[in-house]
Amino acid sequence: MFVSVFTKEPWCDDWSDPEQLDLYIQDLTGQGYSLTYGLFDDEDELIGISLGYIKHWYSGTEYIINELCIRTDRQGAGAGTFFIREIEKAVRELGLKQIFLLTDPNVPACEFYRKNGFTECTSNVAFAKSIE
């Protein structure tokens, strides 16, 4: 499901290398601090995933979401909002104080997060540098 969502618009990620994909998913799920959630429909089909980890920070423990997606054919029908609410309940029960994530400001997911109560962290900026 991850590949089918993120290789389409608006992301168009190239996950054609299965070894790189396996390593990435292992990075996200194979650590002691990993925290993964799945959303299943009434037929027990996986329709959403959240891949992240627990981070201990001075202001409290957080859930950092690295990847969150809803199956493409289920987007726009409330599944994502339901999933976010369920994740909020679950991490609250764990005693976590915040959910943090990054997204591209030019994709529909950005507005989705705003509509679901996330606020932009304007005091931070992300940097990257290619070293090839």
Where do the language-model regions lie?
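Conserved acetyl-CoA-binding loop-helix of GNAT-fold acetyltransferases
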Residues: I70, G76-K89, R114-K115
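Conserved GNAT acetyl-CoA-binding A-motif
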Residues: I84, V91-D104
